[in-house]
Design a protein with these regions (language model features):
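Short, acidic Gly/Pro/Ser/Thr-rich loop/turn segments
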Residues: 11-14, 60-62, 137-140, 155-159
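Cysteine-nucleophile active-site neighborhood
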Residues: 58-120
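Pocket-forming structural segment of enzyme catalytic cores
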Residues: 99-148, 152-155
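Flexible, charged surface loops at secondary-structure boundaries
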Residues: 45-49, 81-83, 124, 142-145
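Structural motif
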Residues: 52-56, 88, 149-151
């Protein structure tokens, strides 16, 4: 059983960020692998049998509400990261992992102006599509150990198949299983069509 953990889902899902966890679970199940999602709200929830950890995006008020709990579990998050547990962090989730030194070598500083736009970001030979809304100077995409972090909002994995495959590969490799192809070709085709439509719309917006 592959276990996918999500931190504070009631607080860190401002732009549908937990859609990333949903698409991972659906993809694993479509490929014939059993998995479950679990809620993480305290350090004791961060157990070694987790195969993936997700940190979403929240408002200032949301982060204020969970501030003490997040501070308490940050050292355990760092230990799991160092031990190879895969993860994904989105927008302010990324910022907080930098602030609490779960991610190292980065500094989150506030810029004079806020950037709010659809973004197509070049990542090697690939492009990453998403919406950027921040006044912090962190990189749009960052990888550390087995984690991926992005300043782009929302369900980034649903829009970017290569990034989805990368994260799925990290999860299954850590869990010690092979990543099969999707058995149900009709679902795979429908997903590809949906992604194409999203790319068409948002690339047009990004070029405006």
């Amino acid at each position: 059983m592959i276990r996918l953990g999500g931190l504070f889902p009631e607080h860190l899902n401002l732009n549908g960020d937990f859609g990333n966890l949903d698409v991972l679970k659906a993809q694993l199940e479509w490929r014939g692998l059993s998995c479950e999602t679990v809620k993480i709200e305290r350090a004791s929830d961060l157990t070694s049998d987790l195969d993936f950890i997700f940190v979403g995006h929240g408002s200032v008020a949301a982060w204020s509400a969970i501030h003490l709990e997040f501070e308490a579990l940050a050292p355990t998050l760092r230990l799991l990261l160092e031990g190879g547990t895969p993860g994904l962090a989105i927008s302010t989730g990324f910022e907080e992992l930098v602030r609490t030194n779960v991610f190292t070598g980065l500094e989150a500083t506030t810029m004079a102006t806020r950037t709010s736009k659809f973004e197509v970001y070049k990542d090697g030979d690939n492009e990453v599509l998403g919406y950027l809304n921040t006044d912090v100077n962190l990189p749009i995409l960052h990888r550390e150990r087995n984690w991926v972090a992005s300043m782009l909002h929302g369900p980034i994995l649903a829009k970017n198949p290569f990034l989805l495959e990368e994260v799925l590969g990290r999860i299954t490799s850590y869990a010690g299983v092979q990543l099969p192809v999707i058995y149900e070709s009709e679902k795979a085709g429908q997903l590809a069509d949906l992604i194409d439509e999203v790319w068409k719309l948002e690339k047009e917006l990004a070029s405006e």
